């Protein structure tokens, strides 16, 4: 596509498209192709009343596992020498800022609900954290990271 606009509904539809094309629900698809190769031991997914993963929200993993996904992006789609995402996809994510917004310092970040954050440093470091911040005041940590980059 040419334009991108975030929409929870679009991600739910995408979840159903993955199921239709692959024959696997999105959570199983991600477990076999992404989460298991990343050695993610635990992951939970929010599901709709019909049992399909919502897609837009509700994938729960530990902070260190979230950092592994950042490492995949920093390494051009590979983890421990194994290709998990195509190089073309990773380039598009960074170029078009699909879910990874570009920061003023050249790094990229992805924020989640209630204070989850994944930050990819322009120096090759990956920083991930989860904090309960329903009021959205968690920018202090990001400001400190950017100040010390």
Where are these regions (language model features)?
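Active-site-proximal alpha-helical segments within enzyme catalytic domains
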Residues: 10-17, 55-78, 116-132
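Homeobox/homeodomain signature
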Residues: 16, 25, 35, 49-51, ...
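Catalytic-site signature segments of enzymes, centered on catalytic residues
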Residues: 1-57
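Catalytic loop of the DD-peptidase/beta-lactamase superfamily, centered on the K-T-G motif
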Residues: 36, 74-149
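Solvent-exposed, flexible loop/coil residues
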Residues: 8, 44, 48-49, 58, ...
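Carbohydrate-binding/catalytic loop surfaces
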Residues: 48-61, 105-115
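Stable alpha-helical elements in mature extracytoplasmic
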Residues: 10, 22, 26, 30, ...
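Short, charged low-complexity intrinsically disordered segments located at boundaries
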Residues: 18-23, 48, 61-67, 97-106
């Amino acid at each position: 596509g040419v334009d991108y606009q975030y929409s929870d509904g679009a991600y739910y539809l995408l979840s159903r498209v993955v199921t239709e094309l692959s024959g696997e629900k999105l959570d199983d698809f991600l477990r076999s192709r992404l989460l298991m190769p990343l050695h993610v031991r635990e992951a939970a997914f929010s599901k709709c009343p019909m049992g399909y993963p919502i897609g837009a929200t509700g994938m729960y993993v530990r902070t260190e596992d979230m950092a592994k996904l950042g490492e995949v992006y920093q390494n051009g789609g590979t983890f421990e020498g194994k290709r998990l995402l195509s190089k073309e996809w990773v380039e598009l994510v960074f170029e078009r800022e699909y879910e990874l917004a570009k920061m003023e310092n050249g790094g990229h970040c992805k924020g989640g609900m209630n204070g989850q954050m994944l930050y990819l440093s322009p120096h090759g470091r990956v920083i991930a954290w989860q904090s309960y911040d329903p009021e959205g005041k968690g920018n202090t940590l990001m400001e400190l990271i950017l100040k010390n980059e």
